[in-house]
Amino acid sequence: MTILLVTGTSTGVGKTVATAALAAAAVRQGIDVTVCKPVQTGDDHDAGEVARLSGVTRVQTLVRYPEPLAPVASASRAGLELLDHTQMATAIVALDRPGALTLVEGAGGLLVELAADGKTLRDLAMVLDAPVLVVTTADLGTLNHTALTLEALAVQSVPCAGLVVGSFPAEPDLAQRLNRENLANQFGTPVRAVIPEGAARLMPPVFAELSIELFEPQWVAGLVA
């Protein structure tokens, strides 16, 4: 069994589409996939989008807070408590199965408080002893944001499973073209996929075919080897 956490260098970088794409690619290789969203704020759109695009039927949100804000703010305004991160970890382990892949999509970036006592997705990764896949962009500023996220993982010895560019335009500008190259060369961390802008608007069968092309099959298979 394998647990892989998915985070972003910020919010809105394409974590959900990246999670769906990796899930779809794994399903097409015959891998049993579960997707978990430990914390959702606002509506439950992310889980529904992952299920729609990937075809994965085991998609679970552990807790949802009503307003689309940072988890601690949304929980506070609703008069609700944040879950303990060890509770989250226990629930995630219970979802995992032998020979299966469990993808855990975080909320916002790596150090967003999503559990009680200020705990973050990084803390959850440490409890689970699981690697983290980092979704980033090719936009101006991404090299700094990516470096900060990778450094935050490294300082706690949390392994990084690679980078994914969550949305790359069909007609990139100069900064986007150069950043795509620099993301691949600057950090010593492999870029696992570059997802075309607008991929989420594809019909699910087309999205699944694209996903197979985006991720190296050997890497995907190796996640549960």
Swiss-Prot record:
Pathway(s) this gene product operates in, as recorded in its UniProt entry: Cofactor biosynthesis; biotin biosynthesis; biotin from 7,8-diaminononanoate: step 1/2
Subcellular location, record wording: Cytoplasm
Keyword Signal: no
EC number annotated for this UniProt entry: 6.3.3.3
SUPFAM superfamilies according to UniProt: P-loop containing nucleoside triphosphate hydrolases (SSF52540)
Disulfide-bonded cysteines: none
Gene Ontology CC terms, in alphabetical order: cytosol
Residue sites binding Mg(2+) per the record: 16, 46, 105
Family membership: Belongs to the dethiobiotin synthetase family.
Subunit structure: Homodimer.
Protein name in UniProt: ATP-dependent dethiobiotin synthetase BioD
Organism name: Mycobacteroides abscessus (strain ATCC 19977 / DSM 44196 / CCUG 20993 / CIP 104536 / JCM 13569 / NCTC 13031 / TMC 1543 / L948) (Mycobacterium abscessus)
